[in-house]
Amino acid sequence: MRVREMQRNWQHLGRWGLLFLGILIICSAADKLWVTVYYGVPVWKEATTTLFCASDAKAYEREVHNVWATYACVPTDPSPQELVLGNVSEKFNMWKNNMVDQMHEDIISLWDESLKPCVKLTPLCVTLNCTKAIINVTSSNNTTLAPNVTISEEMKNCSFNITTEIRDKQKKEYALFYKLDVVQINNSNTSYRLINCNTSTLTQACPKVSFDPIPIHYCAPAGFAILKCNNKTFNGTGLCRNVSTVQCTHGIKPVVSTQLLLNGSLAEEKMIIRSENISDNTKTIIVQFKNPVKINCTRPNNNTRRSIHIGPGRAFYATGEIIGDTRKAHCNISEKQWYDTLIKIATEFKDQYNKTVGFQPSAGGDLEITTHSFNCRGEFFYCNTTILFNHTRVNDILSNNHTRENDTITLPCRIKQIVNMWQRVGQAMYAPPIAGKIQCNSNITGLLLTIDGGEGNESETLRPGGGDMRDNWRSELYKYKVVKIEPLGVAPTKAKRQVVQREKRAVGMGAMFLGFLGAAGSTMGAASITLTVQARNLLSGIVQQQSNLLKAIEAQQHLLQLTVWGIKQLQARILAVERYLKDQQLLGIWGCSGKLICPTTVPWNLSWSNKSQDEIWGNMTWMEWEKEIGNYTDTIYRLIESAQNQQEKNEQDLLALDKWDNLWNWFSITRWLWYIEIFIMIIGSLIGLRIVFTVLSIINRVRQGYSPLSLQTLIPNSRGPERPGGIEEEGGEQDKDRSIRLVSGFLALAWDDFRSLCVFSYHCLRNFILIAARTVDKGLKRGWEVLKYLWNLAQYWGQELKNSAISLLDRTAIAVAEGTDRIIEILQRAGRAVLNIPRRIRQGLERALL
């Protein structure tokens, strides 16, 4: 009976076991994805950061007093790297570019910084007694191209009282001033003052300061990169499909000018017109030439410079006298080159915007806006450009046949020494006169224009503009943007981290801030293969950059304070280290230090992205993937951190068990030797105890006078009185007697004990399994009965609800029908009553007549 019951139980248990095994196989067939961390992925985001400068200042000028202070920049890379990003498109917007604002602030700061140690000319705010300047004229052999106005009509000879080295004494001095720098007092023809005295303080530029522009390369710190658009016809906004990454921009000359852009970069294929809104007359239009137009500017007269002491330790440098050629300063431009350029501008406007354009001079404003202002060898020129733009229509240019090769357009120029730079109120600069003849040759590479505007006009008028120096820098930085590199990426894979296992951590390496972007256009699968290459040189790149910046900072230690560039270099150093430490901190928190690919125990949630693994790794780039899961990145990071915290807690709990941290260690050779040692000790203890008890038993029986039988003698096991030894049939034949075998030897004794222990363990285990199987079977049967009961109950209540609903509908239908019948009956009665009215009237009349 027991065997049959056991077989039945095992049949039920086998059936349920097969069912659970099938469910397990089905569940395991679906691949579960886990979050995996990747370090060194080619992903970036738009950002603003502190840029630093690189320049070859020593190659341009040995004098260290250049106003742009580029000697404080790091040296340029002799072989700059430019990495083309294949299969990458990026949006650019030159009108909202932080690089432009940053360069503008840098140039202003450098300008102000160069004037800090210079002399303040506050003592010159006194009454000036001025007369017309008398110039010693020396005839010139060639005056055909010079303006008719001489320099004597542009200058005033002024005398004034000034404090000497001894404060309580004054002396009378004289100096030549330009008419633009002085204004009359109370409309007097002889009393004048400097133009700035009622509005701003005046600082004289230091005598050794040079204003010649030196190319400045803006560079991104480690952890950031500069993206460059290489489309030859890029208009400054929109999507660029030819993108590369560079460490530094090209050399940008900080030329401060209005109307005409000087010595900038040229367009490669054709002239480019750029505007944020071409129909808005408040927006500046930037025109970039393909071919430059040469402009040669000259101050012919030969000045002498004299020093006037205006107090202890302070000197004012003024123009002493003018010797030689007294022609006015002027600029010469090739007539053919200029008019060819205007025709090309009109053609481009016709092609791009379907508008016919003409050119007119500036509509008015400050002198810096209405003229072409620029600096030439330390003197500030203001040139009248009316002759360049005085053309109502381009047809006028063509009809006048301005095609002669040797014809020259001469622009009359005026010079100012008191300059209010950057259109700021409250601060002005006095530029000391430059001795000798001044001449500078430049290339016009672009124009700053404004449009008169108007709705529905097919013809437009263009005028020269400028004044906001941001447009000057924007004309060079239009193709750049700064991005922040995000080397940490997460993606789903089938790999899961092996939890609670101790191992040595490798030394971490980084990803070079420029080189690893080379895989940006590749699919995620292809990029992940090259993670080692992409991530190898970040730390070394940072160290190299830090070394270069440190050398540049050390070069300024002789100064009392750092320049603008020095501060930026310190900021770049700190920022680079912070970026690297931040990434390494996250990797450490996640338990991924020193790993390029780091599986985790966080399951991938399909709500983050329900794309298949093949679709993700085979078709998407890392940039596309980052945009896909960008909203969930913080959530994933928190889950990884929580999982790592739990993992570390589990490791701590497991390590508390000392050597039980790894199951496989139980099968090592040293463990087996330890197991054998324990086994021998247990067997020896059992044998020793058996010997002790046997000896004690023999001694006890000897003391009682009893001699033991042979150890090989089998002693019959006496049966109880209730069980006789014979059987009833065949004369009481005896049954087989049971006997107890007395073993001989200690090994036989140990084996007998061990066998008895195994038999006992087997019986106990078998009984336990049978009880467990029977319990499980009964539980499953009870559960099945409960489910069937619940199902029957649900069916019963469903049927009841159905019957109730049908009954309710029937009653409702009956009530509606009865109500409808009553309404119809009432209407019929009312109708019959109305129809019977004439009959009742007739009957009433008949009765009345009778």
UniProtKB/Swiss-Prot annotation:
SUPFAM superfamilies: gp120 core (SSF56502), Virus ectodomain (SSF58069). A motif (Di-leucine internalization motif) lies at residues 849-850. Disulfide bonds join C53-C73, C118-C206, C125-C197, C130-C158, C219-C248, C229-C240, C297-C331, C376-C440, C383-C413, C592-C598. It comes from the Viruses. A lipid is attached at C758 (S-palmitoyl cysteine). The chain crosses the membrane at residues 679-699. This is Envelope glycoprotein gp160. It comes from Human immunodeficiency virus type 1 group M subtype F2 (isolate MP257) (HIV-1).
